[in-house]
């Protein structure tokens, strides 16, 4: 079946009797969404433990907050490095192999962190090596989580793409909420089996990520391979790698804007979020208040994503991305002017999470729709790599900027990053993609 002609770029596509409506495909998509959601919940719990308990373990092993931060950054770096290879693997062998391998590698990372916790008091060199390896390879779990949202669109009907992608984003909520709170139950588990207290959360993480791997291995039929049997690709089209595919995507207005929008939103979100606890601590906020603020921020990021997906399918991708940009601007204004008011800081962080979601869901869908079927998987991997690089830049740059220009200045600079994407939004509304895949 050939690819459909595009509607006006960025608007919600109209329903048509495409192959995605065939009963067998609908059943396969339903199964795919269930399995992807289950893997997101299970794997997310393990990855969430690394986000919070991991930095504590890193501080314990390295005995230096600076080196602990470097070790923690390895997770983001590896997530960026493996995004493209995982996408290439998916294009050749399907999502089942790609995502299954990623979660399996993340499982080995958690095992290494258990060993690092056990050796922290007796062999610091080996413990540090295992720590960096474990935190780094855990980044494959982050990459798998991001690429799972694209897997949800492989068999999705055009008019349902955003809402089905958003379900996978929403499933991440469970892991990001439960994972960071594994400290107490993890210590209790470690005590019961004779391990170091810090090893306990990673025993739980190992089990959860191993289960996520098993769930992904049940992904039959593979959604990407099944989609390939219906999507006609020009046999004379030149075979090319990710760089060429990204180059072609960059020449398409919608794809270019979607990529820039996701990277800008991710940079702003990570940069402001990373320094918010430091700002709150400077103004005397308790650890409980800081934790509550971050939890509310995470709630804004993920909890409303199904509503965002429904709205993007109904009203179009570009209007929702524009709304997300406006929400991010409001977030930087509220947080930047909050000063010592922890209530306003929390409100700003909540808006920051909502704005990120309003950009990520429709922009991911727009990127998928704007490129050809032949390039789609590689472009998706390239976009995830770019997002993780953006996260690393946001996290690394926010600390020095906080010291130089303060929290208000950091938010003002973040607002400028959002505004820089406006010209691309205007141009994307005038341009049409080369072809919108069905």
Where are these predicted regions, by residue range?
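C-terminal membrane-cytosol helix-exit motif in multi-pass small-molecule transporters
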Residues: 183-184, 206-232, 424-429
């Amino acid at each position: 079946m050939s690819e459909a002609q595009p509607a006006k770029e960025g608007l919600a596509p109209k329903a048509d009797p495409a192959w995605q409506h065939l009963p067998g495909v609908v059943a396969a998509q339903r199964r795919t969404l269930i399995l992807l959601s289950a893997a997101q919940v299970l794997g997310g719990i393990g990855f969430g433990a690394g986000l919070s308990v991991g930095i504590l373990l890193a501080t314990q092993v390295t005995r230096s907050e600076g080196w602990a931060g470097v070790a923690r950054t390895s997770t983001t770096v590896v997530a960026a490095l493996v995004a493209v290879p995982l996408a290439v693997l998916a294009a050749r062998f399907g999502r089942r192999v790609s995502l299954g391998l990623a979660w399996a590698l993340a499982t080995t990372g958690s095992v290494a962190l258990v060993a690092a916790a056990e050796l922290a008091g007796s062999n610091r060199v080996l413990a540090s090596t295992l720590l960096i390896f474990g935190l780094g390879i855990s980044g494959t779990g982050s990459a798998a989580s991001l690429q799972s949202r694209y897997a949800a669109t492989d068999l999705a009907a055009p008019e349902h793409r955003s809402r089905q992608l958003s379900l996978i984003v929403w499933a991440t909520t469970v892991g990001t909420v439960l994972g960071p709170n594994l400290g107490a139950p993890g210590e209790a588990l470690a005590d019961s089996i004779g391990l170091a207290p810090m090893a306990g959360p990673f025993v739980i993480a190992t089990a959860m990520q191993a289960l996520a791997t098993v769930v992904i291995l049940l992904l039959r039929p593979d959604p990407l391979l099944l989609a390939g049997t219906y999507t006609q690709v020009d046999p004379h089209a030149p075979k090319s790698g990710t760089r060429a595919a990204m180059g072609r995507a960059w020449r398409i207005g919608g794809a270019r804007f979607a990529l820039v929008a996701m990277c800008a939103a991710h940079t702003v979100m990570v940069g402001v979020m990373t320094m918010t606890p430091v700002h709150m601590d400077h103004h005397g906020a308790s650890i409980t208040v800081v934790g509550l603020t971050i939890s509310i921020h995470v709630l804004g990021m993920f909890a409303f994503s199904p509503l965002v997906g429904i709205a993007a399918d109904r009203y179009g991708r570009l209007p929702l991305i524009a709304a997300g940009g406006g929400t991010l601007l409001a977030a930087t204004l509220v947080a930047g002017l909050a000063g010592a008011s922890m209530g306003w800081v929390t409100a700003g962080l909540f808006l920051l999470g909502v704005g990120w979601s309003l950009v990520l869901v429709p922009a991911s869908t727009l990127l998928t729709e704007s490129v050809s079927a032949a390039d789609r998987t590689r472009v998706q991997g390239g976009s995830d790599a770019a997002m993780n690089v953006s996260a690393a830049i946001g996290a690394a740059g926010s600390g020095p900027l906080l010291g130089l220009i303060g929290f208000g200045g950091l938010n003002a600079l973040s607002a400028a990053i959002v505004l820089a994407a406006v010209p691309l939004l205007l141009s994307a509304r005038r341009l049409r993609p080369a072809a919108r895949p069905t």
